[in-house]
A protein has these predicted regions:
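N-terminal soluble domains immediately following signal/targeting peptides that reside
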Residues: 3-153
Length: 153
């Protein structure tokens, strides 16, 4: 199999003060996840997001994400705990969707995002981040050179 040419991840962060919830959705190409965790893009032995997922697969994924990804809301780093995981597409285009959700009683005044996912593997990796805080929407492109960005509201 040939690797997909697009070295990209997508992250969407949403905070609605009415619901008092901060939601993070992260979409990663499954081939890249396998490359990062078992060093073989075509090896699907972990079965992430599938009925036959191996017991330690989610832990391995979280260990990796904790090294390359974080969100700080109002200066406090959020502990990564996967609320839901889904697999969409197939073959080289299969994407793993992760959702994280956090109650947030206080108004969001700043969000700091680090998304260096897969920059350890691919020099041309780009990580697109969309941030929606109530009616304020912004988009960022994070990469190996610029892995962190802070937004102030």
């Amino acid at each position: 199999l040939q690797a997909h040419p697009l070295k990209l991840s997508l992250c969407q962060i949403e905070y609605a003060s009415v619901e008092k919830t901060l939601t993070i959705e992260l979409r990663l190409f499954l081939m890249d996840v396998n490359e990062a965790l078992v060093f073989d893009p075509d090896n699907n032995e972990l079965g992430l997001g599938q009925p036959d997922e191996v017991p330690n697969a989610e832990g391995m994924l979280l260990d990796y994400l904790n090294r390359f990804f974080y969100i700080k809301a109002n200066g406090k780093q959020l502990a990564l705990k996967i609320k839901s995981m889904s697999l969409n597409g197939q073959g080289n285009d299969a994407a793993l969707g992760l959702t994280f959700s956090y109650p947030s009683q206080e108004k969001i005044t700043s969000i700091e995002i680090k998304n260096a996912v897969f920059t350890d593997l691919f020099f041309d990796q780009s990580n697109v981040v969309y941030v929606h805080v109530d009616d304020d929407s912004r988009s960022l492109m994070l990469n190996k050179k610029t892995p962190v960005h802070k937004l102030v509201y």
